[in-house]
């Protein structure tokens, strides 16, 4: 797969990840874009402003992860805003992404972390729900190191992420017969979807968490249209949809749109 990496030059984790990537896997065939502003506000990323992105299939943003709890984490997620644009991007607009690339990267992130006992015991490897900017046309995702300065400077953790990014050189979607889907419900860190992304045949692209409820039709349409693969299936975190009436509204919408659904608690994982 032809991919590129982008990072903000003043972002500690992004810079650390890129340094490890260059040490281990640097290739002139993989463009590395150094941004002069934070990734989430870089809506100007396109072939016109960055000619090296011509013929690129996918863009990976390497960045910091921040959280109130400050737990060490290696995380992966799609970009976009289901509602307001408090952290870059556009309100109600999400980016294009690939369910297959996200599944592949998440499995590799888990695998590479497991190869380093210290990292695997310290860091939480997790998906995140779709959130924040930028809003660009190139299919993309974020891979992040967090959640505090000690972690942002952790070279071993950054190396795990660099290895994961590099593995995309060997990715060919023709080799996989996964079922692409979007996911609805649950918390921001998606424990039920994590298990499915790792262990089932489902490949998740965009995630609409419970805190972005109520789900409306345009959100589902956005998720469908902004997934490279053809979406016919939706995963539902059954207990992560609030009250029964909230869940029923989701089911009614899916029936209206003609999408099939599967409950996470009834999915092999």
Predicted regions and their residues:
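N-terminal catalytic or cofactor-binding beta/alpha core of small enzyme domains
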Residues: 1-137, 148, 155-159, 166-191, ...
């Amino acid at each position: 797969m032809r991919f590129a990496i982008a990072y903000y030059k003043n972002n500690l984790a992004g810079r650390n990840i890129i340094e490890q990537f260059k040490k281990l896997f640097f290739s002139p065939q993989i463009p590395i874009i150094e941004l002069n502003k934070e990734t989430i506000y870089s809506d100007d990323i396109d072939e016109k402003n960055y000619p090296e992105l011509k013929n690129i299939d996918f863009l990976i943003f390497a960045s910091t992860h921040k959280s109130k709890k400050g737990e060490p984490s290696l995380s992966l997620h799609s970009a976009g805003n289901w509602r307001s644009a408090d952290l870059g991007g556009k309100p109600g607009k999400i980016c294009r992404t690939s369910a297959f690339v996200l599944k592949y990267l998440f499995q590799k992130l888990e695998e590479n972390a497991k190869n380093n006992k210290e990292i695997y015991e310290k860091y939480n490897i997790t998906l995140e729900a779709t959130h924040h900017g930028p809003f660009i046309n190139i299919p993309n995702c974020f891979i992040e190191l967090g959640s505090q300065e000690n972690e942002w400077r952790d070279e071993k953790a950054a190396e795990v992420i660099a290895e994961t990014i590099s593995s995309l050189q060997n990715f060919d979607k023709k080799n996989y017969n996964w079922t692409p889907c979007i996911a609805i419900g649950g918390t921001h860190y998606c424990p039920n979807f994590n298990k499915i992304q790792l262990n089932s045949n489902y490949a998740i692209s965009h995630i609409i968490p419970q805190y972005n409820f109520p789900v409306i039709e345009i959100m589902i349409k956005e998720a469908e249209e902004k997934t490279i693969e053809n979406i016919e299936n939706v995963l539902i975190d059954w207990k992560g949809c609030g009250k029964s009436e909230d869940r029923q509204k989701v089911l009614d919408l899916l029936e209206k749109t003609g999408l099939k659904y599967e409950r996470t608690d009834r999915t092999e994982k």
